């Protein structure tokens, strides 16, 4: 019996690596995409069960031609996990234009490149699922996230749009908007991060939620609920509390 195939961008680190291992443990074939050959090899060494089901591909998500070449070689995906991204905290009082552009190129355009490359086979199969990794910083602006947050807001909006187009094609779209997760990215933050979650726990929650019939999911529950409520409050009140509790 053929295995279900998942495409995971940003597979070699953080949530991507943790989710890769969970899917392989549950019998999936994973096409892991990362720009780092070294990290992909390190990840493969940590996979103890069904190691042969991990198929690493070195590719920068900015390279649409190479992504399309990979798409031609691999099995039709049942899941496209659009996860690759970067995070650099910025002081928005400084000149950050190169950082802003880099975040847009990787976090937004990179996701679109992967989407465009791997969607056609899924459409032919008229069955599948797409999970887009956004963030609570896509709900409202957070300290130090002037480069990162807008790209995640764009991804959330993108997911909201494509779900209508793809529903009739048999493709389920979800957006995952986690709070703070322990990764190499969040280790760059110099402020208190409420509800900071272990990356393996986060990946387990993604696996659990991908089976549910809901568009957007976030975790941990209490802090994500807190942030959701604050995104609905008057700006004066929400910005005051964020300054007191996060910055």
Could you say what each language-model-derived stretch is?
Residues 12-13:
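Conserved glycine-rich cofactor-binding loop
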Residues 26-42:
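Conserved glycine-rich Rossmann-like NAD(P)H-binding loop of the short-chain dehydrogenase/reductase
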Residues 83-89:
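Conserved NAD(P)H cofactor-binding loop of Rossmann-fold oxidoreductase domains
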Residues 91-104:
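Substrate-binding pocket helix/loop in short-chain dehydrogenase/reductase
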Residues 115, 151:
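Active-site helix of classical SDR
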Residues 135:
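Residue(s) in the substrate-gating loop at a strand-loop-helix junction
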Residues 175, 191-225:
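C-terminal helical subdomain
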């Amino acid at each position: 019996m053929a295995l279900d195939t998942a495409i995971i961008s940003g597979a070699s680190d953080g949530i991507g690596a943790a989710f890769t291992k969970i899917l392989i443990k549950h019998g999936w074939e994973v096409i892991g995409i990362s720009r780092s050959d070294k990290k992909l090899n390190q990840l493969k060494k940590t996979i103890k069960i069904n190691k042969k089901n991990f198929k690493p591909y070195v590719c920068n998500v900015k390279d649409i031609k190479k992504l399309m070449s990979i798409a031609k070689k691999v099995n039709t995906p049942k899941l496209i996990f659009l996860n690759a991204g970067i995070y650099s905290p910025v002081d928005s009082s400084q000149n950050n234009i190169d950082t802003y552009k880099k975040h847009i190129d990787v976090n937004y355009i990179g996701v679109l490149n992967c989407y465009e490359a791997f969607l056609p086979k899924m459409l032919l199969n008229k069955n599948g699922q797409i999970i887009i990794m956004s963030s609570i910083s896509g709900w409202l602006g957070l300290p130090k996230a002037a480069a990162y947050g807008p790209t995640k807001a764009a991804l959330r909006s993108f997911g909201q749009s494509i779900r209508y187009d793809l529903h009739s094609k048999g493709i389920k779209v979800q957006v995952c908007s986690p709070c703070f997760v322990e990764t190499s990215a969040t280790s760059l933050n110099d402020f208190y991060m409420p509800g900071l979650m272990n990356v393996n726990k986060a990946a387990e929650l993604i696996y659990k939620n991908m089976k549910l019939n809901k568009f957007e999911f976030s975790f941990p529950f209490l802090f994500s609920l807190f942030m959701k409520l604050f995104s609905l409050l008057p700006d004066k009140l929400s910005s005051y509390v964020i300054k007191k509790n996060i910055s």
